[in-house]
Amino acid sequence: MPDQIQIEVVYALPMRQTTLTLKINTGSSVEDAIRESGILARHPEIDLAVNKVGLFGRAVALSTRLERPTRIEIYRPLLADPKEIRRQRAEKAKLQSLK
């Protein structure tokens, strides 16, 4: 039997966070771990073709192999373009400073 590692799969919403802990075989992919965790059944809005994933805040591919205990994070899509928001804030601040 292959060695197993303990991992967490985390998905955060604005008002709550789901954290699932499980043991998987060493060398399993991030995608395998997510599917095995059952989080997709709890959160049907997660689409692995759309949602980005990461390990401790660093984006990784679904095919990344897991060799040590870790935390897999599933990220929600951005609601707005960060560059556009910064541009709008700068424009608003400029207008307010002219008053």
UniProtKB/Swiss-Prot annotation:
InterPro entries given for it?
Mopterin_synth/thiamin_S_b, RnfH, RnfH_sf
Q: Name one Pfam family in it.
A: Ub-RnfH
Signal sequence segment: none
List, alphabetically, the SUPFAM superfamilies matched: MoaD/ThiS
HAMAP family membership? UPF0125_RnfH
Query: Which family does the similarity line name?
Result: Belongs to the UPF0125 (RnfH) family.
| Name of the featured protein | Protein RnfH
This chain's source organism reads Tolumonas auensis (strain DSM 9187 / NBRC 110442 / TA 4)
The upper taxonomy is: Bacteria, Pseudomonadati, Pseudomonadota, Gammaproteobacteria, Aeromonadales
Q: What gene name does this entry carry? A: rnfH
